Regions:
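Enzymes that bind and transform nitrogen-containing heteroaromatic metabolites
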Residues: 2-211
Length: 211
């Protein structure tokens, strides 16, 4: 059984007409790591039980990779996002097993200077000025939000552009590993919104950036 706590949240400051939100939707350990030193987070998979999987599939169906949707019974329209941004490390998880467009139901962007050309027509590479390109995407009229999938380096580069955090905290301590943000020290304030807990020990928190 999951428990939801909804806290009163001050509406975020408007930053422009039609501005789309950039949401960092990410899983991490209790001590804030999104993976081991190489970015591997498979140890967290053991906590994905039926109740928690059903919530993720129902609330964030667009975050289920395209090649897995039929297997897990996801056939829903995009609910929060129509665009995904990820670094090469995150993208390579699928690429290494032959999946060139892991989120074919979204507009896909990969931030990398290592790939000379895109492996898939649906995937646009961003080699330079990642912040500028994301600002262009946020300024587009209409549409849904933008999902920042990871990893640490890309999140660090885009930290000032992030409007919302959705953090899935798994009941594990890593001790060391890949941090949520690869960025220099600077305090940045977020306001806590909804909190959801699950019987498997997973805690999901939603935060809004205070500017």
């Amino acid at each position: 059984m999951s428990v939801v706590v909804a806290l009163a949240v001050t509406p975020p400051r408007e930053t422009g007409p039609g501005l789309r939100k950039l949401t960092y939707y990410i899983a991490c350990s209790i001590d804030g790591f999104i993976g081991d030193p190489q970015g591997d987070a498979t140890s967290m998979y053991s906590f994905v039980n039926e109740e928690y999987q059903a919530w993720m599939n129902g609330e964030y169906p667009e975050t289920v990779p395209a090649h897995m949707r039929a297997a897990v019974g996801v056939d829903a329209d995009n609910k929060h996002f129509d665009t995904v941004i990820q670094g090469l490390g995150s993208y390579r998880i699928g690429l290494d097993v032959g999946v060139t467009s892991p989120y074919a139901h979204l507009r896909e962007y990969v931030a990398t200077r290592s790939l000379a050309e895109s492996p898939d027509p649906n995937v646009e590479l961003i080699a330079d000025d990642l912040v500028g390109r994301v600002r262009e995407l946020k300024a587009e009229e209409g549409g849904l939000g933008i999902w920042l999938c990871g990893g640490s380096t890309v999140a660090g580069e885009l930290i000032e552009e992030i409007d919302e955090l959705v953090i899935k905290t798994y009941p594990q301590v890593y001790g060391s590993g890949m941090p949520m943000f690869g960025a220099d020290f600077e305090p940045r304030d977020f306001e806590l919104g909804e909190v959801r807990t699950f019987d498997n020990g997973v805690l999901v928190r939603k935060y809004t950036r205070q500017r």
